[in-house]
Amino acid sequence: GEGLQYSVDPADNEVYLYSQGETAYIRKMYPCFDQPDLKATFQLTVTAPAHWEVISNSPVKSKNAVEGNKNVWEFLPTPRISTYITALIAGPYYHVHNEYVGEKTVPLGIYCRKSLAESLDPEDIFLVTKQGFSYFEKVFGLAYPFEKYDQIAVVDFNWGAMENSGAVTFLENLLVFRSKVTERMYDARANTILHEMAHMWFGNMVTMQWWDDLWLNESFAEWSSHLASAEGTRLVTAWTGFNSERKNWAYRQDQLSSTHP
């Protein structure tokens, strides 16, 4: 998807929205100079149906009821961030909350479609999330640079996840398991959670100048996520999965005629 995405849940006909900005797609949601080295502060005000939740990069400043059975959500200003990691997610999402207490206290949220509420296992997601924060704060020597951390399962998503600052979107089937899955799927979910979390420091706080260095952004997050999985969580075999999947994938890419130094 590109820009602001719209979907209807066939289970209850509820509408869900989410944004996707990377690479230069957020300009389809609002006018901007959509390049990573031009950063600004953002403050969203959103009018939405009264039964909807609205999520953005920053915490909610206020929510007030207005005529027409709607609420007006006002969010706190963001720190200076690139346009492509600004986010707007809205709909009647089911949600659960927790907090991480480390260098600072970080409110945590997990969101999914209402129809998937029974399939969500927030305990394991929160556990990996807290372990990731603890590990990265220690390794990077810096506290988490934003004010809250929400993780949202969205439908019709083209990627595994997207590292919007404070409001990470995930491919729904990667975050919410609707049936019994293998340990490999738990490994994949944890790796994705940690990959996106690593971007909060490297990619969101420290950002490449132009899109041709996006590979460095992603490579660092990929390395960091496997390191954090192996050293900071119960998933100590993370490097085995890296060698059997990522390494072979890189070898295949190197053989393509389109690959160049």
Residue ranges and their predicted role:
Residues G1-E147:
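Acidic/His-enriched low-complexity segments
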Residues F75, G109-P261:
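Hydrophobic alpha-helical and helix-loop surface patches within well-folded domains
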